[in-house]
Regions:
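Intrinsic-disorder/low-complexity accessory segments
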Residues: 1-194
Length: 194
């Protein structure tokens, strides 16, 4: 029965998509362009991930973001930056970012995804909190689940900052390099395939 319902739902979705394909394609093509504009004009223009005391964590977080299609830049040399907002405290700082720091510009097609993964605050409407209180008072339990992992810089323990202006500096594009395999021995007798 469950599979039948899933099939019915999938077919209905495909039929709706097919009959509205022009509108869907227009929205599909417009969304990345709108994300670039919104990222260039919004109050948060970039996220900075500094190596800090545990640079491997910043490296792993940057790799995760790249794997999700988010564009990352890396400082080839130290960068002077001001107007940075600390993700942990919210304080505004000016600092010298060390070489190896990452910048996640938000004027990119994946800007909204970057914000969703990096922002430390998840805004909720006041009406939601009123409904939540009513649910709790009626003994229905909470509808909120753990939000501590919603901000990846906080989850990874990375020194992270957001800024309304992208810091000028020698930033290099950080694209994921595809791993290339090869056989190291000249005349192997046997090998393993994983």
């Amino acid at each position: 029965e469950t599979v039948d319902h899933q099939l019915t739902s999938s077919v209905a979705n495909l039929e709706t998509l097919a009959s509205n394909r022009r509108d869907f394609m227009a929205q599909y093509l417009a969304a990345p362009r709108e994300a670039v504009v919104k990222g260039a004009e919004g109050p948060v223009r970039a996220w900075i991930l500094a190596p800090g005391k545990q640079p491997d964590r910043a490296d792993r977080l940057a790799a995760l973001l790249r794997d999700e299609g988010i564009e990352i830049l890396r400082a080839a040399s130290p960068v002077k930056a001001s107007g940075l907002r600390d993700a942990w405290t919210g304080k505004t700082l000016a600092m010298d970012l060390p070489a190896g720091s990452f910048m996640v510009p938000l004027d990119q097609p994946a800007g909204p995804l970057a914000r969703a993964l990096l922002d430390p605050h998840v805004p909720m409407e006041a009406g939601f909190f009123k409904e939540e209180r009513e649910w709790l008072e009626r003994g229905k339990g909470t509808r909120i689940y753990d939000t501590t992992a919603w901000s990846l810089p906080l989850l990874y323990g990375v020194d992270a900052y957001w800024t309304g202006t992208k810091p000028a500096g020698d930033w290099k594009d950080e694209r994921t390099q595809e791993a290339r395999g090869s056989v190291a021995a000249a005349d192997p007798v046997f090998g393993y395939l994983f």
